[in-house]
Amino acid sequence: MNLGTLVSETRNPQTMDLDALPTPELVKRFNEQDTRVAEAVKATLPDVARAVDAAAAALKSGGRIIYMGAGTSGRLGVLDASECPPTFGVPHGLVVGLIAGGPGALLKAVEGAEDSQQAGEDDLVALNLQEQDLVVGLAASGRTPYVIGGLRYARQSGCTTVAVSCNPDSPIAREANIAISPVVGPEALTGSTRLKSGTAQKMVLNMISTGAMVKFGKVYQNLMVDMKATNVKLVDRACRMVVEATGIGREEAEALLKQTDFEVKPAILMALTGLDAAAAREKLAAHQGFLRAALEH
């Protein structure tokens, strides 16, 4: 493949003079380019919705969401995966981020790590990949061998696969059941796909993980009711969520949370139904953790 023909590698005619610009104009040019990212992502929303449903289906069937990528793309996957346990109360390992070259590549580039299809397969083998898992391959260029190898192995293993790329009709898209391709155009700094391409990928990942967790019962209204209250800020947030969801006073909310070890969902259910903590947990379990269903039935 001639990489120079990729949209993400071509020069942007609107930023040819970056090195001659005064600082206010320099940052204005970057900002002007960034405004195009949301529109590019908007054009992919039908495919993002399919990915959300596939991710939720994977979780409900006992599978995992596995992101894999190299460089910036890999780091974004690891970032999104690492935020899921504290935000949604899920166990570590339910959402996984793989980066070419291993964890050390998060801080320092591992030269050549992305160029091996076998490495992508090997990393999934090491995770004991199961057909219930969803594998999401991330590559701004759409042609990273590490990601191609991983997606190909995942597909052969019976997994649903998703490709996220910022070039149209990319090689990784052809390896996936669902292709998401926000074409953001040439970068302000030629080929620096940590810019618009990285922003677009982050926006897509935000929707995939958050949307899947909504459909997995981890959200009530727009509240992260399975959040782990692990510090003073989050204990305060837990209290505010109970107050906002129920209309009770703060002192009563704090008292309920102490009975639930600061778990928000049973505290809300207790406030709205009069159940005790054990009965609230039992009712939530009977409705697979969906608070709305527990309240309505």
Swiss-Prot record:
It comes from the Bacteria. Keywords: Carbohydrate metabolism, Lyase. It catalyses: N-acetyl-D-muramate 6-phosphate + H2O = N-acetyl-D-glucosamine 6-phosphate + (R)-lactate. Transmembrane segments: none annotated. Induction: Induced by MurNAc 6-phosphate that releases the repressor MurR from the DNA. Repressed by MurR in the absence of MurNAc 6-phosphate. Homodimer. This is N-acetylmuramic acid 6-phosphate etherase.
